[in-house]
Amino acid sequence: MAVAGAVAMSGGILLLLLLLLLLLAAACVEAGELPPISRRSFPKGFIFGTSSASYQCEGGAAEGGRGPSIWDTFTYQHPDKIADKSNGDVADNTYHLYKEDVHMMKEMGMDAYRFSISWSRILPNGSLNGGVNIEGINYYNNLINELLLKGVQSFVTLFHYDTPQALEDKYNGFLSPNIINDYKDYAEICFKEFGDRVKHWITFNEPWIFCSKAYASGTYAPGRCSPWEMGKCSVGDSGREPYTACHHQLLAHAETVRLYREKYQFTEEVVRQSQFIHDNDLHRRSAKLSFIIQNYLLLGIHFQPGPGGRVCQYRH
């Protein structure tokens, strides 16, 4: 009882101190001791922007010659895996309301807009063999031109988790090396059509997130995982497929960057999400392996000096 009372008293004192600190901070703000945050609070040249992804906001899923992506199929077939059981058929309707969206960005004082291009809106069948969709190119030209008119820079992501369904049906998308050249062909169309106005390109958005959630847990399209995973998938191999997909993403990135540097060089980026792994005595080796896989597998390719062959070496 004495110990419990001491713990309760200690917790009460800590709570009181926290409340006092919050009141002190609020008083400082009211007294004007902390300057308000403004553009002057940031270094010269700092870019303020907003971002989106094509499937999450465009809508117009069956308009303008667009072909389906794996997310169309996933949301239609597995609405139970979507929190509100919605899909991207309409979404934010940016396909029709992009001028209003750009106007709001300008009103908010944004310097840049990072958006993704829908691969299947440019190549409805995923590859050059299926033909180029001029209506899709016109849509993105109109969006980019509207951004320029309002003084907003375009930061373009080429892939944000939305593999064309045609390529998923043809050879299982990023599980096949065939995706490398098809992705490069798609990227080159974008460089040719939009590169005179777009100076910032992002090859892949968070590649590890795509690989792990699409092929390990099955919670993202195309929803592949081993039977015992929480995604309750009908097909997949959580121990192999995420690494196969990541491998092909890295090769596609490398081929596209080589092409870009040789023919269209301005600047290129990749958006990565690194992970912090908690270490503990019981699972120290597992934590180390998880850290290497989630961070080194992809970071080492994009940043030099990287970890070299540590991922491959660790398998021993």
Curated annotation (Swiss-Prot):
Residues 1-31 form the signal peptide. Its EC number is 3.2.1.21. Gene3D superfamilies: Glycosidases. GO terms for biological process: carbohydrate metabolic process. A beta-D-glucoside binds at residues 56, 160, 205-206, 314. It catalyses: Hydrolysis of terminal, non-reducing beta-D-glucosyl residues with release of beta-D-glucose. It is an enzyme of class 3 (hydrolase). The active site is at residue 206. Disulfide bonds join 225-233. PROSITE patterns: GLYCOSYL_HYDROL_F1_2. Pfam families: Glyco_hydro_1. Keywords: Disulfide bond, Glycoprotein, Glycosidase, Hydrolase, Signal. GO terms for molecular function: beta-D-fucosidase activity; beta-galactosidase activity; beta-glucosidase activity. InterPro entries: Glyco_hydro_1, Glyco_hydro_1_N_CS, Glycoside_hydrolase_SF. Glycans are attached at residue 125. Belongs to the glycosyl hydrolase 1 family. This is Putative beta-glucosidase 9. It comes from Oryza sativa subsp. japonica (Rice). The lineage of its organism: Eukaryota, Viridiplantae, Streptophyta, Embryophyta, Tracheophyta. The gene is BGLU9.
